[in-house]
Design a protein with these regions (language model features):
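Core alpha/beta nucleotide-donor-binding catalytic domains of modification enzymes
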Residues: 1-202, 228
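Inter-helical turn/loop segments and adjacent helix faces that build the functional surface
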Residues: 202-212
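Short coil/turn linker and secondary-structure boundary residues
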Residues: 89-92, 139, 161, 188, ...
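AMP-forming adenylation/ATP pyrophosphatase catalytic core
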Residues: 2-5, 9-26, 38, 46, ...
Length: 416
């Protein structure tokens, strides 16, 4: 790889970049290339190495190599040590814990030095591995898109550069690099794919790595279009309130849009089977589905609700007369003197006698609540809400002015 064939770093001039430097060929080549473009692009560079405290003396040697490299390249160097074995979360694998702690450390350093981006040395071979792993897990369109060149505070400029080109660059420049021997054994699924799976694919399908990287780029392009369509659908159909979230008329959405909406609201970790069940629920007239320990979906005619669990309803609050009374997450009710005129045109404003409000509270509904709507006899509030076609999930989110089990005003619905 000669100077003319260096990757095109598509960044604005004057950026401050933090290079994630492991000491391996990929990140060493990245640091060297950025150092060559530093003046041309008016870059402010720094490098960070995270020692995971896993490989003992080898880890310390990696850190020392990175420090010496940065001295030669005139790049400020930051070292942070994390104890991966001691910091693993319950059920977390060593590789996952190392990645989590590494990114946390890099972000701490980025914040401390005021860098615009953390620059990562993921290359074409890494992208091919990532896409294949996602496909084998059945992760869908987002997984097929692999890694994005830019995401949040991360920048990956080498995704179209093969690993062999980076190693050739270093060989041409006479620059050594460190080798993590754990990467040379098939001790993890990714290692097995790198050492055996991809070489076998390349043997049968020459150019497989490049093809997978191109596929990922195409999928990311498609995904951006689909995410914009999801944004437009949610802008028109999504409501949020104390009850949770509501999608109006979900059955009008194309299934591809609907699946992405569900992933957006339920989290990307929702299983494929659950995704299919939720899609079917959206097409049905009524039904409920427990999505997880903290989320339930409920379908009513014309809407689907995503309700947090457990449902925590606020305690009744004594009504301030006059004054304002707040019900946590439900809003504020203002009581003030008013002339005896009708305000029936506004369901959120009503005139009540002061003596009727004595001892009243602001609360949500309870079993046995009763109300006497204007022009009607005494009725169960639940029957009134059913007649008014108030969806069941909304009923628990309805603020009520009440004395005992007597409802004086179901806010937005009717007055007693």
């Amino acid at each position: 790889m000669n100077r003319a064939s260096l990757p095109d770093f598509s960044i604005a001039r004057g950026r401050r970049l933090l290079i994630a430097l492991s000491g391996g060929a990929d990140s060493v080549a990245l640091a060297w290339m950025l150092a060559q473009r530093r003046d041309e692009l008016d870059l402010t560079l720094a490098a960070a190495h995270v020692d995971h405290s896993i490989r003992g003396a080898e880890s310390r040697a990696d850190a020392e190599y990175c420090r010496e490299l940065c001295e030669r390249l005139d790049i400020p160097f930051y070292l942070e040590r994390v104890d991966v074995p001691a910091s693993r979360l319950p059920g977390e694998g060593i590789e996952t814990a190392a990645r989590r702690l590494r990114y946390e450390a890099l972000r701490r350093i980025r914040t401390r030095i005021g860098a615009d981006w953390i620059v990562l040395a993921h290359h074409m071979d890494d992208q091919a591995e990532t896409v294949l792993m996602h496909l084998l897990r059945g992760s869908g369109p987002d997984g097929a898109g692999g890694m994005a060149e830019r995401s949040d505070d991360l920048y990956r400029p080498l995704l179209n550069t093969p690993k062999r080109a980076l190693e050739q660059l270093l060989a041409d420049q006479g620059i050594p690099w460190r080798t993590d021997r754990t990467n040379l054994t098939p001790c993890t699924p990714r290692n097995a794919l790198r050492l055996h799976g991809l070489p076998a694919l390349e043997e049968s399908y020459p150019g497989a790595r490049a093809a997978l990287a191109r596929h990922a780029e195409s999928m990311r392009c498609e995904n951006r279009f689909m995410e914009a369509a999801v944004d437009a659908f949610l802008c028109e159909h999504l409501d949020s309130g104390p009850y949770g979230q509501r999608i109006r008329d979900p059955e009008t959405a194309d299934e591809a849009i609907l699946r992405r909406v569900i992933r957006r609201l339920c989290g990307s970790s929702v299983s494929h089977d659950m995704l299919l069940s939720l899609t079917a629920l959206c097409r049905s007239a009524r039904g409920r589905l427990r999505v997880s320990a903290s989320l339930q979906a409920e379908k009513t005619p014309g809407a689907i609700y995503f309700l947090p669990l457990p449902r925590e309803l606020p305690e009744p609050t004594a009504l301030a007369i006059p004054g304002e009374t707040s019900l946590e997450h439900f809003g504020t009710l203002r009581v003030q003197p008013a002339p005896p005129v009708s305000v029936r045109d506004d369901p959120f404003r009503q005139v009540l006698r002061t003596d009727a409000l004595s001892g009243a509270v602001l609360r949500t509904r309870r079993d046995g609540d009763r109300i006497r709507p204007l022009g009607c006899g005494d009725r169960l509030l639940s029957d009134v809400l059913t007649d008014r076609k108030i969806d069941r999930p909304l009923r628990d989110a309805l603020p009520l002015v009440a004395r005992g089990n007597r409802i004086l005003w179901a806010v937005g619905v009717c007055i007693s």
